[in-house]
Amino acid sequence: MIEFYSKARLPSRFGSFEIYVFKNDENKDHAVIVHGDVRGKSDVPVRIHSECLTGDVLGSMRCDCRDQLIESLKYIGSQPYGMLIYMRQEGRGIGLLNKIRAYNLQDQGLDTVEANLEQGLPVDERKYDYAVDVIKYFNIESIQLITNNPEKLKYLEEHGIKITKRIPIIIPPTKFDEFYLETKRERMGHLF
């Protein structure tokens, strides 16, 4: 369950947005970046983006998270309305410390899936129930989900969110993230 706390204007290089802050029952803040009026609308472009300190903030090239975030904001900002739900779920939900430990294991030759399993952690521990709550908070009729992740599609549909379209995010791989993206496609079913 989420609770709305505050909002403010957020002018950005990607357009005019408002930022909403919600807290969940784990007392984590989740940011929702909204462009235009999404209340009660259909076919709202929505990106559910999980926090990635190394990629989003530090510009790590081990993943494509920052590029996905930027491309999503550009797309949403170019539409009449849309939203990005920024979930505080670092490292596919395992937290920053375990993510850095996974990086170390990847440096030793494991892939991203094997690195989590080696630590006794799930491959992906993210939860999308708060995203469902946010979409319902805005009374959105249907969404166009900006994602490559089939698990997000499945979860949202199973929890009553009508998805009219999947919008893929195609980011050309680099020599640094090519193996990571290949693992996401082959072992996690991501749709590129």
Swiss-Prot record:
The prosthetic group or cofactor this protein requires is:
Zn(2+)
Entry-linked CDD domains: GTP_cyclohydro2
The active site lies at 124, 126
GO cellular component, alphabetical, reads: cytosol
The broad enzyme category this protein falls into is hydrolase
Q: In which pathway does it act?
A: Cofactor biosynthesis; riboflavin biosynthesis; 5-amino-6-(D-ribitylamino)uracil from GTP: step 1/4
What reaction(s) does this enzyme catalyze? GTP + 4 H2O = 2,5-diamino-6-hydroxy-4-(5-phosphoribosylamino)-pyrimidine + formate + 2 phosphate + 3 H(+)
Positions of GTP binding: 47-51, 68, 90-92, 112, 147, 152
Q: Which GO terms describe its molecular function?
A: 3,4-dihydroxy-2-butanone-4-phosphate synthase activity; GTP binding; GTP cyclohydrolase II activity; zinc ion binding
Organism domain of life: Archaea
- Summarize where Zn(2+) binds, as residue positions: 52, 63, 65
Gene3D superfamilies named among the record's database cross-references? GTP cyclohydrolase II
The GO annotation for biological process reads:
riboflavin biosynthetic process
Entry's EC annotation: 3.5.4.25
Free-text remark on how the cofactor is bound: Binds 1 zinc ion per subunit.
Signal sequence coordinates: none
Keyword entries, A-Z = GTP-binding, Hydrolase, Metal-binding, Nucleotide-binding, Riboflavin biosynthesis, Zinc
Q: What does this protein do?
A: Catalyzes the conversion of GTP to 2,5-diamino-6-ribosylamino-4(3H)-pyrimidinone 5'-phosphate (DARP), formate and pyrophosphate.
Q: Which family does it belong to?
A: Belongs to the GTP cyclohydrolase II family.
Q: What is this protein called?
A: GTP cyclohydrolase-2
Q: Which organism is it from?
A: Picrophilus torridus (strain ATCC 700027 / DSM 9790 / JCM 10055 / NBRC 100828 / KAW 2/3)
Q: What is the lineage of its organism?
A: Archaea, Methanobacteriati, Thermoplasmatota, Thermoplasmata, Thermoplasmatales
